[in-house]
Amino acid sequence: MGYVKNDSEIVGGYSLIPVIHDVDSIESLKGKINCCDLKIDSGMNRLGFNSPTEIACAIKLLEEYNVKMRAVCTHFYSKESILEQLDKFNRLIAPLKGVKIHCSATTGVLGGYLFDEVRVGMLAYGFGSLDVKPSMIITSNVLAIHNLKVGDVAGYDGIIKCNNPTKIAIVSGGYYDGIDKVLGEYVIVKEKYCKVLPSICMDMFYVDVTGIDVKVGEKVEIFSKRLADKDNVIRPYKQMTAIKGRAKRIYHYQ
């Protein structure tokens, strides 16, 4: 996220290094910082300086306010356009000497564009095409189990209709927790892929566990590398960031 002017006191108070993307940000941080990174817009048209004139103006202000430019950066928006973006980026930063460069998120790193620093996202969590160990998993537990007969229904408006004898598990987690954005087609219960049924509630959801010896309290794997791979989720940002504050976070240090 780019620097927000209302946060100038926080940036200065904690000696943070802001990424500056416009001249107004430099003005608002006058006297509060001694170092910054400069964001260059190389084609995404989101944040950043995109002309030599703008960059020259920024450098003049930084020098006037005695602020060191630590690094310049951009953001690759498409692996197919990296070379085109690099060409524009290199032309814009040509006058700048002795500063670090960081441009690459996971896609750029996998393409070999490393520069001085990198900004990996999903790769740090074990997602992507490299053979790396996943470091994030979302799990829940079975709250209840029901054996339904042919003709039985379940869920709001009876959306789940049983054409065959069906064993369902009610699993903790719902809209309130962001589960609706996390769930794919399957979850894993006792190392078996189980179909998620089409009814998510505020605090729980339904899973078909027919033929599996499942007990109340059983762990349910809701999101993981293997589930993302099975559902063919290539860029699982939405799932990785969707879970809200009520869910318990457990950190393992190795």
Outline where the language-model segments fall.
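C-terminal accessory subdomain/extension
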Residues: 147-254
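Gly/Ser/Thr-rich beta-alpha loop segments that engage phosphate groups in nucleotides
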Residues: 4, 45, 50, 123, ...
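Short, hydrophobic beta-strand segments that form beta-sheet elements in well-ordered domains
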Residues: 1-2, 16-21, 100-104, 118-120, ...
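Active-site loop/helix belt of alpha/beta enzymes
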Residues: 27, 32-35, 40-150, 211
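A residue-level structural signature of the nucleotidyltransferase/glycosyltransferase Rossmann-like core
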Residues: 17-18, 101, 115-117, 135, ...
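N-terminal active-site wall of soluble small-molecule enzyme domains
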Residues: 1-30, 80, 109
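Electropositive phosphate-/nucleotide-binding environments in soluble metabolic enzymes
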Residues: 20-23, 52, 83-86, 132, ...
